[in-house]
């Protein structure tokens, strides 16, 4: 069995509220940084979430 290509990443809010989502992505096919527009409940609006490493 080989090593899994799926890694966990942290999506951090660009509104700098400290809110984040944890999700998975395929490390082999999606090599760039992920940017997703999602809801930030602290800011109470949709903002861009950018990929960051899980500490």
Swiss-Prot record:
The molecule here is called Large ribosomal subunit protein bL33
Q: Which HAMAP family match?
A: Ribosomal_bL33 (MF_00294)
What are the GO MF terms of this UniProt record?
A: structural constituent of ribosome
The record's listing under Gene3D superfamilies reads: Ribosomal protein L33 (2.20.28.120)
A cellular component term, taken from the record's GO annotations: cytosolic large ribosomal subunit
**Domain of life here?**
Bacteria
Taxonomic source organism: Gluconobacter oxydans (strain 621H)
Entry keyword set:
Ribonucleoprotein, Ribosomal protein
Q: Which cysteines are disulphide-bonded? A: none
